[in-house]
């Protein structure tokens, strides 16, 4: 399904990011990547608290297309999950393996994410979906303050993605522009990744 869209939009390389919190999903998308020339990277999932997580990371990273992992933080009930000491060994291992950490978070996670990013200064961290600010309600001030603090750290990148998916189909350009402008002011082009959020995007847009 993606192939024709890639060609039509003159996109030459893509990264697949996991959509389910299972290692089986990571194996599945790594297999797709092996067979698909334009897929240049995969961001998968592991259970960072599993006693065998390091061996799992070792196995998955035998495929050089594995670039990092994304825990589904926005679905984890414990808002302080990322600060747990039980994660330290596995996160230090990500650094050792040269892998990244995608932070799928909401605005209420950002203060903890700042503490987390300072705790692991050598871990490359990507904030997904600009941290999902509540754009329809115009909630920008606290989000902007927290994102500004994060942008001051060298190990933080921001993924420009998922914006219209979060708003829904009844959105206007005027709603989005203030957030877009702030992100580009904070991170500039060098630390911004564009993500299509495809196929989830097709729920609201082409």
Question: Could you say what each language-model-derived stretch is?
Answer:
Residues 1-2, 25, 52-55, 110-113, ...:
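Alpha-helical scaffolding within the catalytic cores
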